[in-house]
Amino acid sequence: MKFYVDFDDCLCETGRAFAALAAELFGKKVPYEEMKHFNLRDSFDLTEAQYAELLGHEPELLADLEETPGASAVINEWIGSGHEVSIITGRPFSTYEASRAWLDRHGLRDARLYYLDKYGRGNGQADCPFILRPDDYFRMTFDYAVEDSPNAFRFFDHLPELKVLVFDRPWNREAGFPNGNYRRCFSWKEIRENAGGPG
Protein backbone atom coordinates (compact mmCIF):
# COMPACT_ATOMS: atom_id res chain seq x y z
CA MET A 1 0.00 0.00 0.00
CA LYS A 2 0.99 3.62 -0.48
CA PHE A 3 0.57 6.21 2.26
CA TYR A 4 0.58 10.02 2.08
CA VAL A 5 1.35 11.52 5.50
CA ASP A 6 1.35 15.24 6.27
CA PHE A 7 4.08 16.50 8.62
CA ASP A 8 2.79 19.30 10.86
CA ASP A 9 0.07 18.37 13.35
CA CYS A 10 0.06 14.79 12.07
CA LEU A 11 3.61 13.70 12.94
CA CYS A 12 4.35 16.45 15.43
CA GLU A 13 2.64 19.03 17.63
CA THR A 14 3.35 22.17 15.60
CA GLY A 15 0.17 24.05 16.52
CA ARG A 16 0.83 23.68 20.25
CA ALA A 17 4.42 24.88 19.83
CA PHE A 18 3.39 27.98 17.86
CA ALA A 19 0.68 28.74 20.43
CA ALA A 20 3.31 28.77 23.18
CA LEU A 21 5.64 30.92 21.06
CA ALA A 22 2.91 33.46 20.19
CA ALA A 23 2.12 33.81 23.90
CA GLU A 24 5.80 34.28 24.73
CA LEU A 25 6.57 36.78 21.95
CA PHE A 26 3.39 38.84 21.78
CA GLY A 27 1.29 37.94 24.82
CA LYS A 28 -1.26 36.33 22.46
CA LYS A 29 -2.64 33.70 24.80
CA VAL A 30 -4.89 31.60 22.61
CA PRO A 31 -5.53 28.18 24.13
CA TYR A 32 -4.72 25.39 21.70
CA GLU A 33 -8.33 24.16 21.68
CA GLU A 34 -9.44 27.63 20.51
CA MET A 35 -7.18 27.68 17.45
CA LYS A 36 -10.01 27.65 14.92
CA HIS A 37 -7.94 28.68 11.90
CA PHE A 38 -5.23 26.70 10.15
CA ASN A 39 -3.57 30.04 9.28
CA LEU A 40 -1.48 31.09 12.30
CA ARG A 41 -1.91 34.79 11.52
CA ASP A 42 -5.68 34.39 11.87
CA SER A 43 -5.54 32.08 14.90
CA PHE A 44 -3.42 34.53 16.91
CA ASP A 45 -4.73 37.79 15.34
CA LEU A 46 -1.22 38.85 14.32
CA THR A 47 -0.08 41.82 12.27
CA GLU A 48 2.02 41.11 9.17
CA ALA A 49 5.16 42.10 11.11
CA GLN A 50 4.29 39.83 14.04
CA TYR A 51 3.53 36.96 11.68
CA ALA A 52 6.90 37.40 9.96
CA GLU A 53 8.63 37.46 13.36
CA LEU A 54 6.80 34.32 14.45
CA LEU A 55 7.84 32.47 11.29
CA GLY A 56 11.38 33.74 11.75
CA HIS A 57 11.63 31.40 14.73
CA GLU A 58 10.53 28.43 12.62
CA PRO A 59 13.91 26.68 12.15
CA GLU A 60 14.71 26.49 15.88
CA LEU A 61 11.10 25.64 16.75
CA LEU A 62 10.94 22.81 14.20
CA ALA A 63 13.99 21.11 15.66
CA ASP A 64 12.33 20.62 19.05
CA LEU A 65 8.74 19.75 18.13
CA GLU A 66 7.15 16.99 20.17
CA GLU A 67 6.13 13.90 18.28
CA THR A 68 2.41 13.21 18.05
CA PRO A 69 2.12 10.07 20.20
CA GLY A 70 2.43 6.86 18.23
CA ALA A 71 3.29 8.44 14.86
CA SER A 72 6.77 7.02 14.34
CA ALA A 73 5.82 3.55 15.63
CA VAL A 74 2.92 3.22 13.17
CA ILE A 75 4.86 4.63 10.22
CA ASN A 76 7.82 2.35 10.91
CA GLU A 77 5.44 -0.60 11.12
CA TRP A 78 4.08 0.30 7.69
CA ILE A 79 7.57 0.70 6.21
CA GLY A 80 8.78 -2.50 7.86
CA SER A 81 5.85 -4.36 6.30
CA GLY A 82 6.87 -3.21 2.83
CA HIS A 83 4.43 -0.32 2.43
CA GLU A 84 5.52 2.95 0.83
CA VAL A 85 5.26 6.04 3.04
CA SER A 86 5.69 9.56 1.65
CA ILE A 87 5.81 12.48 4.06
CA ILE A 88 4.38 15.33 1.97
CA THR A 89 4.64 18.69 3.67
CA GLY A 90 3.50 22.19 2.80
CA ARG A 91 6.38 23.72 4.77
CA PRO A 92 8.73 26.09 2.91
CA PHE A 93 11.66 24.19 1.38
CA SER A 94 14.04 26.27 3.52
CA THR A 95 13.04 23.94 6.37
CA TYR A 96 14.34 20.81 4.61
CA GLU A 97 17.40 20.19 6.79
CA ALA A 98 15.51 20.75 10.05
CA SER A 99 12.62 18.58 8.85
CA ARG A 100 14.84 15.73 7.65
CA ALA A 101 16.82 15.86 10.91
CA TRP A 102 13.58 15.69 12.94
CA LEU A 103 12.45 12.62 11.00
CA ASP A 104 15.83 10.94 11.40
CA ARG A 105 15.94 11.67 15.15
CA HIS A 106 12.51 10.10 15.53
CA GLY A 107 13.53 6.89 13.78
CA LEU A 108 11.95 7.76 10.43
CA ARG A 109 15.10 7.58 8.29
CA ASP A 110 13.34 5.38 5.73
CA ALA A 111 10.38 7.72 5.24
CA ARG A 112 10.53 9.75 2.02
CA LEU A 113 10.18 13.52 2.51
CA TYR A 114 8.66 15.71 -0.20
CA TYR A 115 7.73 19.38 -0.41
CA LEU A 116 4.49 20.38 -2.14
CA ASP A 117 3.36 24.00 -2.30
CA LYS A 118 -0.03 23.31 -0.72
CA TYR A 119 -0.60 26.88 0.48
CA GLY A 120 0.83 29.18 -2.21
CA ARG A 121 4.04 29.98 -0.33
CA GLY A 122 6.36 29.17 -3.23
CA ASN A 123 9.19 26.69 -2.87
CA GLY A 124 11.82 27.67 -5.46
CA GLN A 125 14.56 25.22 -6.55
CA ALA A 126 12.18 23.45 -8.92
CA ASP A 127 14.96 21.07 -10.00
CA CYS A 128 15.35 19.64 -6.48
CA PRO A 129 14.22 15.98 -6.22
CA PHE A 130 12.48 16.66 -2.90
CA ILE A 131 10.19 19.35 -4.34
CA LEU A 132 7.06 18.08 -6.04
CA ARG A 133 5.75 20.16 -8.91
CA PRO A 134 1.95 19.88 -9.17
CA ASP A 135 2.15 17.69 -12.28
CA ASP A 136 4.57 15.33 -10.49
CA TYR A 137 2.33 15.13 -7.45
CA PHE A 138 -0.84 14.51 -9.45
CA ARG A 139 0.83 11.52 -11.13
CA MET A 140 1.35 9.91 -7.72
CA THR A 141 -1.18 7.49 -6.27
CA PHE A 142 -1.98 6.62 -2.68
CA ASP A 143 -4.26 4.22 -0.86
CA TYR A 144 -4.43 6.24 2.37
CA ALA A 145 -3.72 9.84 3.34
CA VAL A 146 -3.20 11.27 6.83
CA GLU A 147 -3.89 15.03 6.82
CA ASP A 148 -5.13 17.69 9.25
CA SER A 149 -5.63 20.73 7.01
CA PRO A 150 -8.95 21.23 5.20
CA ASN A 151 -7.02 23.54 2.85
CA ALA A 152 -5.11 20.49 1.59
CA PHE A 153 -8.14 18.29 0.86
CA ARG A 154 -8.21 19.56 -2.75
CA PHE A 155 -4.98 17.66 -3.36
CA PHE A 156 -6.93 14.41 -3.05
CA ASP A 157 -9.61 15.13 -5.67
CA HIS A 158 -7.72 13.18 -8.36
CA LEU A 159 -7.88 9.95 -6.30
CA PRO A 160 -11.55 8.95 -5.96
CA GLU A 161 -10.72 5.70 -4.11
CA LEU A 162 -8.34 7.34 -1.61
CA LYS A 163 -9.19 6.87 2.08
CA VAL A 164 -8.41 10.12 3.92
CA LEU A 165 -7.77 9.85 7.66
CA VAL A 166 -8.24 13.35 9.07
CA PHE A 167 -6.24 13.86 12.25
CA ASP A 168 -8.58 15.68 14.61
CA ARG A 169 -7.43 19.25 15.34
CA PRO A 170 -9.40 22.33 16.50
CA TRP A 171 -9.10 23.99 13.06
CA ASN A 172 -10.70 21.09 11.19
CA ARG A 173 -13.62 20.29 13.48
CA GLU A 174 -16.09 22.44 11.56
CA ALA A 175 -14.84 21.39 8.13
CA GLY A 176 -17.16 19.46 5.88
CA PHE A 177 -15.67 16.37 4.28
CA PRO A 178 -15.86 16.17 0.46
CA ASN A 179 -17.08 12.57 0.41
CA GLY A 180 -17.57 9.40 2.43
CA ASN A 181 -13.92 8.37 2.08
CA TYR A 182 -12.93 10.85 4.80
CA ARG A 183 -12.81 9.68 8.41
CA ARG A 184 -11.89 11.69 11.50
CA CYS A 185 -9.26 10.02 13.70
CA PHE A 186 -8.20 11.04 17.19
CA SER A 187 -4.92 9.11 17.54
CA TRP A 188 -2.34 7.14 15.62
CA LYS A 189 -3.79 3.98 17.13
CA GLU A 190 -7.08 4.86 15.44
CA ILE A 191 -5.29 5.74 12.20
CA ARG A 192 -3.58 2.35 12.21
CA GLU A 193 -6.90 0.57 12.82
CA ASN A 194 -8.63 2.50 10.02
CA ALA A 195 -5.81 1.68 7.63
CA GLY A 196 -6.57 -1.98 8.22
CA GLY A 197 -3.67 -2.48 10.60
CA PRO A 198 -1.39 -3.23 7.65
CA GLY A 199 1.38 -5.62 8.43
Which residue ranges define each predicted feature?
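Active-site neighborhood of HAD-like aspartate-dependent phosphohydrolases
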Residues: M1-E53
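Short, acidic loop-to-helix structural element flanking the phosphoryl-transfer center
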Residues: G56-I87, R91-S99
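Residues at the starts of beta-strands that form the adenosine-phosphate
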Residues: G80, E84, R112, K163
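Substrate-recognition "cap/lid" segment bordering the active-site pocket of phosphatases
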Residues: F93-V146, P150-D157
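Structural recognition of alpha->loop->beta junctions
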Residues: R105-L116, T141, F177-G197
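Acidic, Mg2+-coordinating phosphoryl-transfer loop and its flanking beta/alpha structural elements
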Residues: Y144-F186
